Amino acid sequence: MRFIATHCYDESLGVIVTEASGLAEPGDILALYNKLHCLSGRYHCRKALVDLRKVSLSYDSASVLYTLDRLEPLLCNLQIARVVEDLDTRQQLIQEYADKQKLLMRNFFDRQTALDWLKTSLDGTRLQAGLATMPG
């Protein structure tokens, strides 16, 4: 299945919402977060919900880390709640990377918990690593 990502700004929540599906290559993920970064500037919004439950990564863990290194400059000023499937160990690797780099990026298994984290967190401040971690 071809990779597709849609983005919209939810003004009532003050959150950029991204939904993606399909088989993702590293370039697809880079484009997704680059677009998110651009939209954050356009809407003056630093909070994002990224729903990746319908995405399959087509690359290995080493490529995941390489991709994250390239993405870090785009992610460092955003607060990102990622909704993911709990069966993919690469998603946990991404969470561990975010914790290590002190990025405001957390994985969640359901959309409402992710939105709650975005609403209750202070905009523009860095939370302590591990404050909102994936259950399990």
Label for each model-derived stretch:
Residues 1-136:
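Amphipathic, Lys/Arg-enriched alpha-helical "gate/interface" segment within cytosolic domains
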